[in-house]
Amino acid sequence: MVFLHAIEGLMSIIIMVSLGYILTGKGWFTPESSKLLPRLVTYISLPTYMIWNLLHTFSKDAFVTLFAGIVVPVLSMLISFMISFLLSNMLSLAPNRKGTFRSAFFCSSSLFVGVPVNLALFGENSTPYVLIYFLANAFLFWTIGNYSISLDGKTAPAKLISIDTIKRVFSPPFMGFTLAVILILLEIPLPDFVMSTCKYLGNMTTPLSMLFIGIAIYGVKLSTIKFNKDVIAVLVGRFVISPIAVLVVASFFPIPELMKKVFVIQVALPAMTQTTILAKVYEADTEYAAVLVTITTLFAIVAIPIYMTFI
């Protein structure tokens, strides 16, 4: 029954992704017009959704208790990174692929994909836990992940902590989260019309995100996907090692059951889409990064129902 519930929860997501794929094939979305969707999600729908959901869900005391759970994703992701570091050297990967491999191994698309997937599986009560994981994921990706990918490229390596890193961490969704937290801690309510506006705009998040994933999948040639040792290692890292790391770390902390389930689903999501962007920026192996993002996206559709059955 749990497996079937997970399948049912994912069916709407699969349909929306398929719609994005089909419409792209019919010419509705071009490379230029498709750029609008992630911009709408990143700058409009996700920030407003965070403001509405957090203010709608949490009191001051409840939020302080919630935030203590961030230690679980931080520790589990650091464990996954250390394992990816060892594996990338043991597998003798090409120098321009090691950092990309590590980032795809330990960082997931915890917001762009995480919000709609967890909403489908657990409902609105899961969103605060999704955001907690997102904070840890965003900080570690834009510091350790960004630095690792920069070592792959021909350009000068990025600094582990820099002004640019801070700007990327403080993205519009993060700022929406921060504003909501400030309002919660100061116990300042927003007018009903503002909350309603945030809710309506925030409801665009899931369909726009899923349409864009369909567009992205259409743009990747399946002939470029080869199941070599490092691709298999990334799949094992994303869908076996990282979820196990979360479960092990979570067993040492008294966190709510729903929080644990959300963290497991969050870590079993596709690699960050920004992995491909950074590979291009640093002149690393962009095609390799695109393949890892695509193949982890496809495998996540299979992995998520399985984890829903056992957690």
Feature names for model-found ranges:
Residues 1-311:
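Alpha-helical transmembrane segments of multi-pass small-molecule/ion transporters
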